[in-house]
């Protein structure tokens, strides 16, 4: 670290230059930008903070259709946890996403389905979507589903999942989407907690060329669950012999043909729940985050429009599943509220080859691509050469979601995928926020590699000192990220447990919403997200961002991915333990001196520790580096550092809730690696 940066708190901000939107972005726009420049953003943002009623009230009337107008824009406070928006108004989410667009332009594409098998791709228009949603809503209504009831949706990323969600919302009921990769036990836990009367699923799923026995998992999970009276089964594969329990299980296609092609939507109150979405905590059972109808819809629409500069003619490719908040907000509710076509992607970036993403973009002339850094790292590692084979010139905006994107991956994304012609939108938000908290407005706000940039409208972001609890004013400060006033799309509660909601988000810093993330605000007022606060390590009084150490490790030519955790240390308070997965074939027990493509385990650890010392300083050097085959990741692509911390702290018997792990099978090998590479060395 150079001496002129030592006194800077957010020192990495001085390593990058602000980037303005390239000419291609403006030349390829189908219309004028919704936010024209940085000054326009500042004006709108200031109004949204100083006069939220005057800002969001007119926008709610402009972007949403109401059955009954609201009489008050906002009430309640973070201190009391009684937030409400657009009071006394009535509307329906399904109508706002489907009907009004179908009436205006029934032949306009709504859902572009990219199936696991590309020969099964199809396009569903708004007119067709309205008919399908009405039919499924009719089935549910005939089963007694009504306003306020909860319905579980356990489907893969196929159009039927979108149809099911909108059908539930059409009746004023509450959908609880459960990711179709969850186990039977995890499914049961969520269905029972939500009190679901009906489950919507399918016979089987297809992903990466493999068959997923979806209905079988549902049957196992619901064994003995008497509260579920009906199961609607979509025929995805048509496999014969799928067990169907009489009087409980019914085929989607057989029931839908009995229904009318149009079912009027049921108006609900602005604050009535639209959906539950379960998110896993570090301890205890998963919590069902509750999102309201009007506030969530408006937040999803506004962020989709202004952050991504989405126009009605655009095509949005969000490579996320509706089992997670990214799929809810930016594959469904955001684009459909705006009447924009959205790509529903069932498969993986590697099936049938690593050209899949780029074929999708070329085939459908996608203008926006929104993906997690995990997928980008995978492609960078093994499939980069596929990008150049396809015409991706339709792209205008590239988004990143799920975790902070490192500056080097940001640059790769910009150059290799965007051909230096696209705006990069690094977005920071979470299940509980409903929509973007920190993100650039494409074309209006200059970007910085590694920074999520600036707060969205209504997000009164601040940095709090985690020790004193005081807000840190000014720029070049670092602490925990919080928000000090309510915004429309924020979660309202945890299902059946408002006390847990209050304890988790509103009590840690009274008067503020606590995001749980560490962050820095640089000299320009841009935000740099550090990751979860429990991913900050304090070594000998030095507060170290694990993201910074991980970035230093990732610069090594042999490292594919890195994760860093802190464990208790008698001498330094905490010690840094690094976990790395390597590029294929890089490590060799028999490597010889001078071999530039292979290295022995001991030499690799030595190099990595020296790399961190050189990049950050001796105080940041890991106590040890553990080489693993893969890192534990949630199904949304985030590394579950809690697992690594527990294992490294000799608490492998206290791992907590692992239901969101996509690769739980790697945990035993990680435990073994820590034992062999760390604990055994301590004994010597």
Swiss-Prot record:
Enzyme class (EC, first level): ligase
Protein name per its UniProtKB record: Acetyl-coenzyme A synthetase 2
Matches recorded under CDD domains: ACS
Annotated GO biological process: acetyl-CoA biosynthetic process from acetate
Residues the record lists as binding ATP: 402-404, 426-431, 517, 532, 543
Claim: Lipid metabolism is one of the keywords in the record: no
Family, similarity comment: Belongs to the ATP-dependent AMP-binding enzyme family.
Keywords assigned: ATP-binding, Ligase, Nucleotide-binding
Matching Pfam families: ACAS_N, AMP-binding, AMP-binding_C
Enzyme Commission code: 6.2.1.1
Organism ancestry: Eukaryota, Fungi, Dikarya, Ascomycota, Saccharomycotina
Catalytic activity field: acetate + ATP + CoA = acetyl-CoA + AMP + diphosphate
Amino-acid positions noted as binding CoA in the UniProt annotation, renumbered to this chain: 207-210, 326, 540, 613
Matching Gene3D superfamilies: 3.30.300.30, N-terminal domain of ligase-like (3.40.50.12780)
GO molecular function: acetate-CoA ligase activity; AMP binding; ATP binding
Highest taxon, organism lineage: Eukaryota
